[in-house]
């Protein structure tokens, strides 16, 4: 029994391993989180080997045509399945039978000609379904979504989609987003969407007003945000079909890629004005055929809730003929937030501005406003409640005039005038007294002056040509200096309350501990994307400053060393310089000290062990060796060179010289007093005299061993002993001395005294005759 169990286990493992291997061969991009990216691989089928481990499977942008029953059978833990942009035309009925945990299914942009409720039956956990871009013309006779109780977002439709039937959405009670691409939708059965009680965001792309009217009738109380696309509001008579919208509970209406005319605008405004809960209207990428001559006066409904108007990229071909909008002045008084962006606005009529009594936010960015037109638009009494004004990407060029035009806006605290062309700015300007935020980025300002108001709490001067920052702004909390040419941090004393600063993409090389800590309130500093010089001081500060990682934005990946070359490209936080690079002066001082101590020790040791003597002797010996070899015997001039102390000269000159030079035969003696060549270096005289003498007589006494020149003569005689290997020295003890009195370095002479007989001058006259006989015999040997 045990054997059969083992065989079964081994067989299962053997089957499982080839499956996983097959998956890896077909799809090589499975990561540690069990997410497999098999997109753009030219697959014709779902790869085999899918296991229960996989949670995300991306098969988008392949050539898959069919999904079969067994393809996904083992992928029981799939949460996300992406099959968009394939060629899928057929799905077996139970293909998704094992995907009870699936939350997102994308079948968009395939070739499905029909939808089957059986496909989605097992997907009771599904939250997001995308089936747009296929070729089905309807959703079937019943609801394909009836079992999808947890569905949150649904995207359907395609160019062939033409009919929505009653019951197609049965089973769906709530949707966060429903998007229907119905450009060619021609038939809508009333009540089809009525089963959905609430849709937070309803997006419908549709071209027929009558069909749209039928759809809206079913969404009156369920759609919170109604997003309409590609609808042409061009025929006034057809606009009447939309009167039903006045009963809608929608809070926001978006009109995108729609068409309007002067004749239909008043009708549409009238409908929107009647919607009891409408708070926001948004128009994007629309076209207006007209010049604003709306002959029908629009009166404000004091009970209306509309507060926000957004117009972006509105195309008005004859914008230069546009009127002053007299017909809608009454409607504007309740608006709190208005955005008119990229719509070629070159002037806001003064009267219109004065009617915007409740306006708190105004965005006129990416338009054609100039200095003069702004002065007219912001006339006295205009925008009395305005707090935020965005005039970026216009044609402003005079900063002083801009400030003066807005000076009367007492409530204005945020002003964005970025991406204008101010250039040089004056020293003095007038500004609204409560201005707290000013955006002057990308305005080609080369230098900041006191024109900048001192009341600011936030200042953005990014992307200019600034070399430094020297303004005193005592209330400033946020400063943005990105993309300038600053080389150092600003002075903290000028901006003592700064909390956040961005100085990225400048010419900042480093900053010190003192500079960093001088900003007492600093919580965020973005100094990324600078060319840092990773000096020892900078690195030491970075590595040891507590909490700097929490302050620096983008740390550590955005802080890169530019120099030295050895660490270029490395992250500042990971660089460690050597001791030599960081403490060069200290190291040089230490080396010099050690060298000095070494020399001092050498001097002391040399003095103690007579190193100087050895050096002098070596030099003298080398000098002597460089001379021609010793003169032959016929060049010997003296029988002996006499080395003696000046204190013993009386005995040498009056006694020894008399005895030896007057002997028969006489001896020739060399005395330094008598025979040294005048003007010649003493050392050379000593060497020459010793070399020209057959013997060297040393008259030893206490005075002798204390004489410097006698020591020289002993030295050279000592070298001669070693060089010629003969006994040329004759020692005469004029008075008894201890052998220890002779310097220890003369080991050869000490050995002679210890091993050979030396002559000692006897005080007894009877013995002196014997002394002279022995001396003469030694000289002749």
From Swiss-Prot:
Positions of the TIR domain: 636-779
Chain ranges on the Cytoplasmic side, renumbered to this chain: 607-781
SMART domains xrefs: LRR_BAC, LRR_TYP, LRRCT, TIR
Pfam families cross-referenced by the UniProt entry: LRR_8, TIR
Protein's UniProt keywords contain Hydrolase: no
Domain LRRCT: 530-584
GO molecular function: NAD+ nucleosidase activity, cyclic ADP-ribose generating; signaling receptor activity; transmembrane signaling receptor activity; triacyl lipopeptide binding
PROSITE patterns reported for this sequence: LRR, TIR
PTM (free text): N-glycosylated.
Main localization (coarse): membrane
Extracellular membrane side: 25-585
Record's signal peptide: 1-24
Key word Transmembrane helix present: yes
Residues glycosylated per entry: 37, 109, 150, 184, 301, 313, 390, 439
Disulfide bonds: 30-36, 350-379, 429-451
Transmembrane parts of this sequence: 586-606
LRR repeat windows: 53-74, 77-98, 101-122, 125-146, 150-171, 174-195, 358-378, 385-406, 411-432, 434-455, 456-474, 475-496, 497-518
Tissue distribution: Highly expressed in ovary. Also detected in brain, heart, lung, liver, spleen and kidney, and at low levels in gizzard, muscle, testis and proventriculus.
Location of the protein in the cell: Membrane
One GO process term, biological-process aspect: inflammatory response
Keyword annotations from UniProtKB, A to Z: Disulfide bond, Glycoprotein, Immunity, Inflammatory response, Innate immunity, Leucine-rich repeat, Membrane, NAD, Receptor, Repeat, Signal, Transmembrane, Transmembrane helix
Membrane topology: Single-pass type I membrane protein
Function: Participates in the innate immune response to microbial agents. Acts via MYD88 and TRAF6, leading to NF-kappa-B activation, cytokine secretion and the inflammatory response. Mediates the response to mycoplasmal macrophage-activating lipopeptide-2kD (MALP-2).
Family recorded in the similarity comment: Belongs to the Toll-like receptor family.
Subunit annotation: Binds MYD88 (via TIR domain).
Protein name, entry field: Toll-like receptor 2 type-2
Gene: TLR2-2
